[in-house]
């Protein structure tokens, strides 16, 4: 009898939960339609995996890529619609959030073809890899639109858990296991600090969790200038700092970049920064509206440390992946300038524009590393010497992406940095911009050093890795070259094409 009553209660509770979920999807599903497409793609992947054999592997890539492209299409159709807050205040849809969601989807779309040959050569489990990539993308998209403290905490955890699993995907690799352990421990610690800061905001605002309501709550409780706000600001900065990986929160970055599978590093190097930048912009600009001087100072310190340490330490690296890890630390310093400037002087527009170019430059470089690594088994910088004599296309692609990362004209990276630094200069950030210009010159040096090695033709400098290098016989069928070509073209577009990009980026007020 007791069992019968408990069973009935369980069925009733399950029915209520299902009906509530159905009600939310029915009345709010249109507001998260791009995310719903990814969810259906995930379900379809699981269904096909449970009923198929190895012959259906190409379908997994097709379903994943199609889901991402359809999500991008859904975002385009929703562009310029009125801002909407849905799911009882948990999620906000506006142009600002959508452009960051587009950047995340673009990263994932380019990373999947970049991973195909790597997965086949290393015999990694394809379904789990694609599931983790799509789920991480989903977490990043929800983080971009997060409008309350709970979603701001849960969404990055969804992304982080998939990131930990992806970084440790090659279980037999000792370096991968070590990198995953460091990543997991530091990620857990940073999440604890982040939720500590969020709890301070919750308490000081009188129990509010929505971002705009927190501002109203702080005004009502008169706590917007209290010491507790400073504690919340520092804690949240540390928590978000781990995701952005500026100095001094960068300790995990070089080890994870070096130890993780290269396609995973390519994915994490851009998506985590895009999602964290969107979240940081909203958190600092809305709940900490009354503490703008304090968070500006904090971010200025992080930007200076990142630009100096990232570029100086990159000079001494012998591994391509570690060099790009420290380079990314310097790059995030430039992005922080846009966050500090804010919307008054097109700071957000310059940040979005530079981030779009950074995606193409960075993924293009990683595509070259994946291609070279699969054919030689190394990512040591010295082993790239003389690559131009064996594979001119790969060498030129690497050179163009590296030059664009360095900011040499007339490549896209130059115009991105020029616009970013110009906005910073107009906002009065003279010292920050000066540091940015000097460190950009330093970065050009170590990028040119690699390019010199790529183009050398002296036999005594060419290593056995390049001497025994074999080009892909069917380049048109190689998916890595597809991603590489797209990224190289996007990294080298002339300045005349900047106007439409800037026009879209400037229309991102939230």
UniProtKB/Swiss-Prot annotation:
Query: Which Gene Ontology CC terms are recorded?
Result: chloroplast thylakoid membrane
**Enzyme type, top EC level:** translocase
Segments passing through the bilayer: 24-44, 59-79, 99-119, 124-144, 149-169, 184-204, 229-249, 295-315, 323-343, 354-374, 395-415, 418-438
State the membrane topology: Multi-pass membrane protein
Primary location class: plastid
Reaction(s) the record says it catalyses: a plastoquinone + NADH + (n+1) H(+)(in) = a plastoquinol + NAD(+) + n H(+)(out); a plastoquinone + NADPH + (n+1) H(+)(in) = a plastoquinol + NADP(+) + n H(+)(out)
Keywords, comma-separated and alphabetical: Chloroplast, Membrane, NAD, NADP, Plastid, Plastoquinone, Quinone, Thylakoid, Translocase, Transmembrane, Transmembrane helix, Transport
This protein's assembly is summarised as: NDH is composed of at least 16 different subunits, 5 of which are encoded in the nucleus.
Which protein is depicted? NAD(P)H-quinone oxidoreductase subunit 2, chloroplastic
């Amino acid at each position: 009898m007791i069992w019968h009553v408990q069973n009935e209660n369980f069925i009733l509770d399950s029915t209520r939960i299902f009906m509530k979920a159905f009600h939310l999807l029915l009345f709010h599903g249109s507001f998260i339609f791009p995310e719903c497409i990814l969810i259906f793609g995930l379900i379809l992947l699981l269904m096909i995996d449970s009923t198929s054999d190895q012959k259906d592997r190409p379908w997994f890539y097709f379903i994943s890529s199609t889901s991402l492209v359809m999500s991008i299409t859904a975002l385009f159709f929703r562009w310029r619609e009125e801002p909407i807050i849905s799911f009882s205040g948990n999620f906000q849809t506006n142009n600002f959030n959508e452009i960051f969601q587009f950047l995340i989807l673009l990263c994932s779309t380019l990373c999947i073809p970049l991973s195909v040959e790597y997965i086949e050569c290393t015999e990694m489990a394809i379904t789990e890899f694609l599931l983790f990539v799509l789920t991480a993308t989903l977490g990043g998209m929800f983080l971009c639109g997060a409008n309350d403290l709970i979603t701001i905490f849960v969404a990055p955890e969804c992304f982080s858990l998939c990131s930990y699993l992806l970084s440790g995907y090659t279980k037999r690799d000792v370096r991968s296991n070590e990198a995953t352990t460091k990543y997991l421990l530091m990620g857990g610690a940073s999440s604890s600090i982040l939720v500590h800061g969020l709890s301070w905001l919750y308490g000081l605002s009188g129990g509010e969790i929505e971002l705009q309501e927190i501002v109203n709550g702080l005004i009502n409780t008169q706590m917007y200038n209290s010491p507790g706000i400073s504690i919340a600001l520092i804690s949240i900065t540390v928590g978000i700092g781990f995701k952005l990986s500026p100095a001094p929160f960068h300790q995990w970055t070089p080890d994870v970049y070096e130890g993780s599978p290269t396609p995973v590093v390519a994915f994490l190097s851009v998506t985590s920064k895009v999602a964290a930048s969107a979240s940081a912009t909203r958190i600092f600009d809305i709940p900490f509206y009354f503490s703008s001087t304090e968070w500006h100072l904090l971010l200025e310190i992080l930007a200076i440390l990142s630009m100096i340490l990232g570029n100086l330490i990159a000079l001494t690296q012998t591994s391509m992946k570690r060099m790009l890890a420290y380079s990314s630390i310097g790059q995030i310093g430039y992005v922080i300038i846009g966050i500090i400037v804010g919307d008054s002087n097109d700071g957000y527009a310059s940040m979005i524009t530079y981030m779009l170019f950074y995606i193409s430059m960075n993924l293009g470089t990683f595509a070259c590393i994946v291609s070279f690594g699969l054919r030689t088994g190394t990512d040591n910088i010295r082993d790239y010497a003389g690559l131009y004599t064996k594979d001119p296309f790969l060498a030129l692609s690497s050179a163009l992406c590296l030059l664009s990362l360095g900011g040499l004209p007339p490549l896209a990276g130059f115009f991105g940095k020029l616009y970013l630094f110009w906005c910073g200069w107009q906002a009065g950030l003279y010292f920050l911009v000066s540091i940015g210009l000097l460190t950009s010159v330093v970065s050009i040096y170590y990028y040119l050093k690699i390019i010199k090695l790529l183009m050398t033709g002296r036999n005594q400098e060419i290593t056995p890795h390049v001497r025994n290098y074999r080009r892909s016989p069917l380049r048109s069928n190689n998916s890595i070259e597809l991603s590489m070509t797209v990224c190289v073209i996007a990294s080298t577009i002339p300045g005349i094409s900047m106007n439409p990009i800037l026009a879209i980026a400037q229309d991102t007020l939230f």
